[in-house]
Amino acid sequence: MTALGMTEKNFLQTCTPVVFRRIDVASVPFEELSLVHTIYADLMHAIGRQIIPEGGQPLPARAIYMSKERLRNGNVRVDNESAFTAALRERGVGIVYPEEMGFRDQIKLWASNPTVIGFSGASLHTSIFFPERRVITLAHGPDIWANQCLIDMANNNDAQYLYDANGLEHIGAGNGFNMNYRIRNPEQLASELAEYALS
């Protein structure tokens, strides 16, 4: 509420039944897998400025990878991600674990404007709080989840969509995830990705 400039006074609480003759409900500015309006980005940018009013210390030469390896359950996971993150770390790519960060820290990370890399997922959607971020989205196959494309388009991100030419090995559901994949050659993918991201 604070980031939106609102207090409890902006809300109506009724303790008895009430009939409203008319209620206007705004259309959604973002609809999953379907559409996004620029006003959605405007709102998110305003929230970002409220949460991090000082902005971030720019780190344009820095690349970080948003890892899911510590998630206990979720939608999609890369089974051998720890080998991949170790190889990225050796090549100078920072590793962060969004699920272990507070909301403000996640937003502050985007404010510093590094190149952010990650497998397609909701953690990359938080780029929307600051305009024109640099994002490299790794797909689990030759197609990409539309939500990331919508966020990148609305935010005017410098977005790249990549996938491993060797293909990820499809393992199936299990261990708390709806789908598991395995990188066939973590060292090779990390080497190629680090060279691409840091060049």
Predicted regions: what they are:
Residues 1-199:
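The feature primarily captures lumenal catalytic ectodomains
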